[in-house]
Swiss-Prot record:
Pfam families xrefs: Pantoate_ligase (PF02569)
Principal location: cytoplasm
Entry protein name: Pantothenate synthetase
HAMAP family listed in its UniProt record: PanC
Pathway: Cofactor biosynthesis; (R)-pantothenate biosynthesis; (R)-pantothenate from (R)-pantoate and beta-alanine: step 1/1
Organism: Bacteroides fragilis (strain YCH46)
Length: 282
């Protein structure tokens, strides 16, 4: 595996491989890689002759600068993991390489980007679209891989691809969990042992809510989850919403649509964790 730091060098390598008819998969990451990322990389390696993994902590998507400072940066360990997964290139640019001048582009995909994360992290998805569109333009991949843990982000990127007419396939990949059910996240590394124990309640509650939902209404299921999370000292619920998996708009009853997802964000101490669960999938 080769580590590349500039767009120019990456494009020089890729143009040769594309000329040979090789398919290129892109896995955009912010580093601090774990088994969830590894599953995306392995899927790309399986489906494309060439896999590029970007490792870049994107400053424009952090609405909380403190979160940006604290975000773990572990490039050496990341490269070892990527090599083991069979990636062809790790693309690790500097901020100056990706943003030679400030990116003033404004992306608006309402109502997808105005609810949930969009409401609580203003500017976040604009930053995501800035960097992902730059990566798509630099790499011009045939496929790009994103985890379903960031469910709203995946929906917004699909819409961005549609509106900007990028010629590529977006591949959504299932959430990867620890054996005990906790959704893998780079932020889990910041949890104390006690916080880690509390955080388990998030996925446990979501799984229980799926059984509960089979015999209860949407509003009863919302209350079931809210009550279970708020009962745990050390957890603070930011939001839990039950939405149409395509439009991300709230649903009032289970029969409203064939694709229903529950999306949750919880502060565990000062670490913000997200998760989701599918109640109905067509």
């Amino acid at each position: 595996m080769k580590v590349i730091h500039t767009i120019k060098d990456l494009q020089a390598e890729l143009s040769v491989l594309k000329a040979q008819g090789k398919k290129v998969g892109l896995v955009p990451t912010m580093g601090a890689l774990h088994a969830g990322h590894a599953s995306l990389v392995k899927r790309s390696v399986n489906e494309n002759e060439v896999t590029v993994v970007s490792v870049f902590v994107n400053p424009t998507q952090f609405n909380d600068k403190n979160d940006l400072v604290k975000y773990p940066r572990t490039l050496d360990a990341d490269c070892k993991l990527l090599e083991a997964c069979g990636a062809t290139y790790a693309f690790a640019p500097s901020v100056e390489e990706m943003y030679p001048e400030p990116d003033t582009r404004q992306f608006s995909y309402a109502p997808l980007d105005t609810v949930m994360e969009g409401a609580f992290r203003p500017g976040h998805f604009n930053g995501v679209c800035q960097i992902v569109s730059k990566l798509f333009e630099a790499v011009k991949p045939h496929r790009a891989y994103f985890g379903e843990k960031d469910f709203q982000q995946l929906a917004i990127i699909r819409e961005m691809v549609r509106q900007m007419q990028f010629d590529l396939e977006i591949v959504g990949c299932p959430i990867v969990r620890e054996e005990d059910g906790l959704a893998l996240s780079s932020r889990n590394a910041r949890l104390s042992a006690e916080e880690r124990e509390n955080a388990l309640k998030i996925s446990q509650t979501l799984f229980k809510s799926r059984t509960f939902a089979a015999t209860h209404t949407v509003s009863e299921t919302l209350k079931f989850v809210e009550d279970a999370i708020t009962a745990v000292p050390g957890l603070r619920l930011e939001y839990f919403e039950i939405v149409d998996g395509n439009t991300l708009q709230k649903v009032d009853n289970w029969n409203q649509t064939s694709y229903v997802v529950g999306c949750i964000t919880v502060f565990c101490g000062d670490v913000r964790l997200i998760d989701n669960i599918k109640y109905k999938e067509s």
